[in-house]
């Protein structure tokens, strides 16, 4: 039973991580360029439908990845090693945890309020409000930067998890 629990928790953790980091890749390299290629009048309707759903999805996947990661440590039987930070396993896992929590924190601090603000600016910008259009462009630029940060951190996090798995 113990092996089954470890296998299930590890599977869920890896699947959630792939979906979370993969969503970042998809957003930055496929979805955003496609959205920017759409005619400006169409962007608002697409964004209003897509953005809240996507933010919800990204944040829940990040939270589930972290939850299953902690469960994975508990069911691994190696949780005592985390207090020592003397092994390659514990150091790489600690690095991965810190980076993952930081990435989720960025999502909650930047992405969620930014999307809310962007959706409130959209109708004003569409009516010709230059200040709203400028602020919206700034938010989109921050989102693009955040997307690249998510991709980069995601690759580092995956690397730390591979090191931990092989340790």
Feature locations, PLM:
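Polytopic transmembrane helical bundles with strong interfacial aromatic enrichment
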Residues: 1-167
